[in-house]
Amino acid sequence: MFRTPAEKHSVLIFHGLGPPQRKLEPGEAPFWLGRDPFCALLDRIARMGADAPQITFDDGNASDIEIALPELAARGLSAAFFLLVGRLDHPGSLSQADVKALAEAGQTIGLHGHAHRDWRRLDPEGRQQEFREARRRLADLSGQPITLAAAPFGLYDRQVTKTLIAEGFEALYTSDWGRASGRRFLRPRNCIDATMDDRALSAALDGHVRLTRQPRRLLGLARKRLLPGGPAA
């Protein structure tokens, strides 16, 4: 099962694999990775032993079950799959039966919400749907307790963090880059995309934040973690 070690470790985010089977959202295309590059990267991860990064998938694309699961199994790897309940059974996305199949294969199911919305802008009704109802549905389908969440678009603030803690989640996985610790609620991840060269991939595998990215990252962290934020209504 998926568990972030107490010592700091890199955590990777993958999205879609292979040719998309649904209409993509604006700006989503670069985050789709071909099967061959994905398999080559898994081979590198499998050779890293105790230093290997953790693996996560966002959005619940059909490629999670068609490509990711068999390739992970072939290498003895596991991952966390952060799923969108509102996309289940839609073309190009996982089915309800696929959620159970992932769980039965030893993979961890996490919450990505219901409709891929900005969690900072939720009103009480939205929080009910995105957090509680979606979580219950995933628990019913997977047979697992849903204790991990990943913020859509990597967007969160102090209010989102407080709400998830109050709801009993163990961790919020972000898109902030860097290394994650199992001792902390907020856990940064390193996003893999099709434009990355070998140097960028190596930095992601290690969780190293490049110097050119550090000022923007620090500013983003300050905004997300220090500003109060809150719902739109």
Please place each PLM-identified region on the residue numbering.
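N-terminal pre-catalytic segment of deacetylase/amide-hydrolase enzymes
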Residues: 1-53, 219-233
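Amphipathic alpha-helical segments that form well-ordered structural scaffolds
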Residues: 37-44, 67, 71, 133, ...
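Short acidic, Gly/Ser-rich segments with clustered Asp/Glu that frequently serve as metal-coordination loops
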Residues: 59-67
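Active-site-adjacent pocket scaffolds in enzyme catalytic domains
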Residues: 2, 77-110, 114, 158-233
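Short, charge-rich binding segments
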Residues: 3, 70-75
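Soluble or luminal CAZymes and related metallo-dependent hydrolases
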Residues: 33-37, 60, 91-94, 126-133, ...
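Metal-dependent polysaccharide deacetylase catalytic core of the NodB/CE4 family, i.e.
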Residues: 9-24, 28, 51-54, 73-160, ...
